[in-house]
């Protein structure tokens, strides 16, 4: 009788079910298409006024995750797409919660937007730093995620205006890496000096660890330049020699905002 009593109590507890796997990122895709332009700039003012769809998607992230409902994420690609989209959606949510701000660092000044402010994924509170450095990087060991997750800053690889999905995840990651490598905001050769995004310095070990073992020239060293080389514009790749000096750009934490003024994105990070 006692076991039946506990069973009936358990049945009364609302349980989040994945009725139609896999997890649907369509609502987030619609948000991105509506509020993010082709340069990765976000219409935060408009999004803050019309946030219902983003909030609904963030609520669904709070119910489901690869950790809480693995059946909703049948492959590694489904899992990784979830975590990339979750990171980007949580970042947007955090910014509009604090909007208007000039920098993402203004959103949680006292203790840190990335390592103290928490969001809920699959019923578990976690920070953006935890998602990136405790889940994505060690679990999936995929360096291209650094060009997919967005920190809401001008110097960050731009926020893509399409959500990541399992079926085309690899192709999507290739696209964002290629876009990054061919963007003078992040990779620029000036005289005999190569100016690179600070992200390539902060996460250098991720790229060198994944330098392809089947590379055409086995003597190529696992350097940042050689990792980027296949994705660079041919003219730039041909000009990179061994005596090129590398310098990392200062990071611009200004908000990646489209203020609807018609102003273009800055030409490049300041070296």
Predicted regions mapped to residue ranges:
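N-terminal secretory signal peptides that target proteins for export/translocation
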Residues: 1-2
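Interaction/scaffold regions that mediate signaling and macromolecular assembly across diverse proteins
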Residues: 21-271
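Bacterial N-terminal signal peptides
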Residues: 5-16
């Amino acid at each position: 009788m006692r076991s039946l009593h506990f069973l009936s109590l358990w049945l009364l507890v609302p349980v989040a079910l994945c009725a139609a796997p896999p997890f649907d990122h369509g609502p987030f895709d619609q948000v991105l298409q509506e509020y993010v332009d082709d340069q990765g700039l976000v219409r935060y003012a408009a999004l803050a006024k019309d946030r219902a769809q983003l909030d609904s998607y963030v609520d669904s992230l709070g119910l489901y995750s690869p950790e809480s409902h693995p059946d909703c994420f049948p492959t590694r690609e489904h899992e990784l797409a979830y975590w990339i989209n979750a990171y980007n959606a949580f970042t947007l949510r955090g910014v509009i919660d604090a909007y208007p701000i000039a920098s993402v660092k203004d959103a949680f000044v006292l203790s840190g937007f990335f390592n103290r402010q928490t969001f809920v994924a699959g019923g578990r509170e976690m920070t953006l730093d935890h998602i990136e450095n405790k889940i994505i990087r060690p679990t999936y060991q995929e360096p291209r995620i650094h060009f997919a997750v967005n920190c809401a800053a001008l110097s960050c690889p731009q926020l893509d205006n399409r959500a990541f999905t399992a079926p085309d995840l690899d192709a999507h990651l290739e696209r964002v890496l290629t876009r990054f490598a061919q963007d003078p905001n992040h990779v620029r050769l000036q005289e005999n000096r190569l100016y690179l995004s600070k992200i390539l310095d902060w996460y250098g070990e991720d790229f060198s660890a994944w330098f392809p073992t089947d590379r055409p020239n086995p003597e190529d060293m696992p350097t940042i330049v050689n990792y980027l080389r296949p994705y660079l514009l041919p003219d730039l790749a041909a000009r990179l020699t061994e005596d090129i000096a590398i310098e990392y750009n200062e990071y611009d934490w200004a908000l990646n905002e489209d203020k609807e003024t018609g102003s273009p994105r800055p030409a490049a990070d300041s070296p």
